[in-house]
Curated annotation (Swiss-Prot):
Protein name: Large ribosomal subunit protein bL12
Similarity comment: family membership: Belongs to the bacterial ribosomal protein bL12 family.
Role of this protein: Forms part of the ribosomal stalk which helps the ribosome interact with GTP-bound translation factors. Is thus essential for accurate translation.
GO terms for MF: mRNA binding; structural constituent of ribosome
Keyword set includes Ribonucleoprotein: yes
GO CC terms in record: cytosolic large ribosomal subunit
An example Gene Ontology biological process: translation
Record-linked InterPro entries: Ribosomal_bL12, Ribosomal_bL12_C, Ribosomal_bL12_C/ClpS-like, Ribosomal_bL12_oligo, Ribosomal_bL12_oligo_N_sf
UniProt entry keywords in alphabetical sequence: Ribonucleoprotein, Ribosomal protein
Coiled-coil ranges (or none): none
Quaternary structure and partners: Homodimer. Part of the ribosomal stalk of the 50S ribosomal subunit. Forms a multimeric L10(L12)X complex, where L10 forms an elongated spine to which 2 to 4 L12 dimers bind in a sequential fashion. Binds GTP-bound translation factors.
Length: 130
């Protein structure tokens, strides 16, 4: 590939939404038969060596949208758009076919704030440590 075609590719990827990037990641993992997960051996090795406490609290969290009552869907949709920056179509897709991950690799306070906003809008949401 030429430098120009690589720059074009970078520009196209930069225009994707978070949901589209997530779908692209899944498609590439399937196509290349790989996963983008961190190796488990490295984590287990550090814990076995005593470098990390066994009961260490996670520093990164994911916010999971578990349920949206039909009568609360519009309010929840607005909150999803607010916290993710997604367009209306992508936010609507995120509120269907639950559970869905609304945010990944976020701080504990941000995850708690996001869960609180979703719950205030009427959704059932939880923050899970990664």
């Amino acid at each position: 590939m030429t430098t120009e075609s690589l720059e074009t590719l970078v520009e196209q990827l930069s225009g994707l939404t978070v949901l589209e990037l997530s779908q692209l990641k899944k498609m590439l993992e399937e196509k290349w038969d790989v996963t983008a997960a961190a190796p488990v051996v490295a984590v287990a090795g550090a814990a076995a060596a005593g470098d990390a406490p066994a009961s260490a609290e996670p520093t990164e969290f994911a916010v999971i949208l578990e349920d949206v009552p039909a009568d609360k869907k519009i309010g929840v949709l607005k909150v999803v758009r607010e916290v993710t920056g997604l367009a209306l179509k992508e936010a609507k897709e995120m509120t269907e076919g639950l559970p869905k991950t609304v945010k990944e690799k976020t701080s504990k306070s941000d995850a708690e704030d996001t869960v609180k906003k979703l719950q205030e809008a009427g959704a059932k949401a939880v923050a899970k440590g990664l």
